[in-house]
UniProtKB/Swiss-Prot annotation:
Higher taxonomy: Eukaryota, Viridiplantae, Chlorophyta, core chlorophytes, Chlorophyceae
Cited SUPFAM superfamilies: TPR-like
TPR repeat placement: 126-160, 161-194, 196-229, 231-263, 269-302, 305-338, 339-372, 373-406, 408-440, 444-477
Taxonomic superkingdom: Eukaryota
Name listed for the protein in its UniProt record: PsbB mRNA maturation factor Mbb1, chloroplastic
């Protein structure tokens, strides 16, 4: 019988407190055996057998059976080895072993999901607070706390995709693009390449850094993983639109609407918003209104601030103040602190000649969003226009403290100082603006303003170098080319002017919109696709019926195909133009995610105007009694299409955040 020192016996074994040990030892015999968890240095929990002491000395435990839970040899050696030395040193070794064991055991045990959720919530709160604080040091500390917490989440559960997305967004906000790219790559590998959120976030990063082809592949991977991921469809369409591919962007957004209609979610509203904004950009006001109206019909769309704000901006160009204010109020009802709504509404009130309303909106927007530089810049420009230069300087300084990397703020501040005759101060502001974010494409505005300043000051050579730097950053900047050519023409440099015009023509490219392009699908194409999706079981479901014009015919074809699946392959879909399109052809084209490969179903017999109307509008007009004079009337009292109807479908809110401004 060998005796083992007390401190050595309990090395590496988790025990209870002194009170619990005393109560346990008084009620248990010396031969009672209990099972404890002893941690290993390899972050693996193992079981060892130990005796609970009933006296000062205790018999050494018997050897652990290898038929039970496997135990590493290092742990067995630590538990069975006997040491010599003074008692204080041994107690110190035991204490250190228990502390190390506790931390290792915490990492080895299965982490509850609620603990990760709470940690993610704290990190999200820290990130939001960092974006809302004006103290630079506090902002850095909050970002550091959020990053540390998110990396802790990844250490606890490397397969949780939420931590990768949030941490990547945090890194992108700090312009740490390489780290974010590596993080997304690790996230895809650790989650089995099946999470669309990581793919979509990675694609947005590549699109932001100018890697268009790589972004396309990543967005394609996101929609392959999950066809109902509206975010990927929206970002992919925005990428194609930025490259001038309007048809491809429209097809992607419409395909996203068809796919995501089965899954009601708030992100679907951005697809309608993108189509409406593209129609408004191309001057098709009727189509834009149709998309905005269709998007706001659902509960998710009615709660989307982006739809209401874009609709209000569209109507602001049409000149009806009542409708514009109503739509802006609806936008603030969806998000009372939206910085975009406050800014757009304030600028519109300024154009309407209401400076007090404009200042009230800007003041409220800055109070709700203290770190948004665009609001400070707009407020400063309003004060400058009113002749309050000192107040404008204060607002510019506040905006720079809110976001020192905002190049638009540096440019506007420098232009104001140049207009006041402070040339040296303007040069200093332009230089600091270039230093703030030298890799940003927005530096073209700073270089252009600086070059115009040097041109007016008579420093022609310096102005040439600044204009050259501007076109190097953005070769498509028409304003920079025009200013440079105007300066050379003023100096009489005819040969240099011709050379600049040739260089501009070589570097310029414009978006070419196809002839007859429309964001509303042709009736024949909608009818064919509706029949296809109905036959596949995607027609009208519990989430809401299809809003296409050919929905009734599609439902009938779908019911017939559902009666016999074998007959579906031989169905011929009649096109309005008179041609025949077999069901298998449509199935192959749609499943290939390329609607642009479908033939043009638009014929001379198609009612193009009917396709531009919002779905269901004709039905509502037919159901309305003849004596009623409100259903088909627009704001001005006429019955023609193209005017926004009186927005009485949704009751006007009784209380608005800015009621005094109505």
């Amino acid at each position: 019988m060998s005796l083992v020192p007390f401190s050595q016996l309990w090395r590496g074994v988790r025990t209870r407190g002194p009170v619990e040990q005393a109560s346990s030892s008084s009620s248990s015999s010396s031969s009672s055996r209990r099972t404890w968890y002893a941690p290993a240095r390899s972050q693996t929990g193992v079981q060892v057998a130990a005796y609970e002491p009933t006296a000062v000395l205790q018999l050494a435990p018997s050897a652990v059976s290898r038929r039970s839970t496997p135990v590493r040899s290092s742990i067995i050696a630590d538990l069975s080895s006997s040491g010599s030395g003074d008692g204080e040193g041994e107690r110190g070794d035991a204490t250190g072993s228990r502390d190390e064991a506790s931390s290792a055991f915490a990492g080895s045990s299965k982490v509850l999901k609620i603990n990760i959720d709470l940690l993610l919530w704290r990190c999200r709160t820290s990130r939001i607070r960092a974006r809302q604080t004006l103290d630079l040091n506090e902002r850095k500390s909050l970002y550091k706390a959020a990053e540390d917490g998110l990396r802790r989440c990844l250490a606890l559960d490397p397969a949780d995709p939420r931590a990768y997305v949030v941490l990547g967004k945090t890194l992108v906000q700090q312009k740490r693009y390489d780290e974010a790219r590596q993080l997304y790559q690790d996230g895809c590998a650790n989650t089995g390449n099946v999470n669309p959120y990581i793919w979509s976030a990675w694609g947005w990063l590549e699109a932001r850094t100018g890697n268009v082809e790589r972004a396309r592949k990543l967005y394609d991977a996101a929609v392959v993983v999950d066809g109902t991921h509206a975010c990927a469809w929206h970002k992919w369409g925005m990428l194609e639109k930025g490259q001038g591919n309007f048809t491809r962007a429209r097809d992607l957004w419409m395909q996203g609407i068809q796919r995501c209609r089965r899954k009601p979610q708030s992100q679907n509203a951005y697809l309608y918003n993108a189509l409406g904004c593209m129609a408004a950009q191309l001057g098709r006001v009727g189509e834009a209104r149709s998309w905005f109206e269709e998007g706001t019909r659902s509960a998710e769309g009615a709660a989307s601030v982006a739809l209401w704000q874009a609709w209000a901006v569209l109507e602001a160009k049409q000149g009806d103040p009542t409708v514009v204010r109503y739509l802006f109020r609806k936008a603030l009802g969806a998000n009372p602190r939206s910085r975009y709504v406050h800014l757009a509404w304030a600028l519109w009130e300024r154009r309407q000649g209401n400076p007090q309303h404009c200042l009230a909106l800007l003041r409220r927007g800055c109070e709700l969003n203290p770190t948004d530089p665009a609001l400070y810049q707009a407020w400063a420009l309003v004060e400058k226009q009113a002749g309050r230069i000192e107040r404008a300087r204060e607002l510019f300084e506040q905006g720079l403290r809110a976001d020192p990397s905002d190049l638009y703020m540096w440019q506007a501040y420098g232009v104001m100082e140049a207009e006041q005759g402070n040339m040296d101060r303007a040069r200093q502001l332009f230089q600091e603006g270039v230093w703030a974010d030298p890799r940003s494409p927005s530096t073209v505005y700073v270089f252009h303003a600086w070059g115009a300043l040097e041109w007016q000051a008579g420093n022609v050579q310096t102005a040439r170098e600044l204009f050259k730097a501007a076109v190097r950053v953005d070769p498509k900047s028409e304003t920079t080319w025009a200013s440079w050519i105007a300066m050379e023409s003023e100096l009489g440099e005819i040969e240099r002017v011709d050379e600049l015009r040739i260089r501009q023509a070589e570097r310029q490219w414009e978006f070419v919109v196809p002839a007859g392009f429309t964001t509303r699908p042709a009736p024949g194409l909608v009818d064919t696709l509706a029949r296809f999706f109905s036959a596949r079981g995607f027609g009208s479901d519990g989430n809401g019926s299809s809003s296409s014009n050919g929905g009734a015919g599609g439902q009938q074809a779908g019911s017939e195909a559902a009666a016999g699946i074998r007959a579906a392959d031989s169905v011929d879909l009649t096109v309005d133009g008179g041609g025949q399109l077999r069901f298998k052809d449509v199935e192959r084209l749609v499943e290939s995610n390329d609607l642009s490969a479908l033939p043009d179903f638009l014929s001379s017999d198609d009612d193009v105007e009917a396709s531009l109307r919002p779905p269901g509008a004709a039905g509502r007009r037919q159901q309305q009694p003849a004596g009623s004079g409100t259903g088909g009337d627009n704001i001005n009292g006429s019955a023609g299409y193209g005017k926004l109807q009186v927005p009485s479908l949704v009751p006007r809110p009784k209380a608005t955040p800015l009621r005094s401004m109505g």
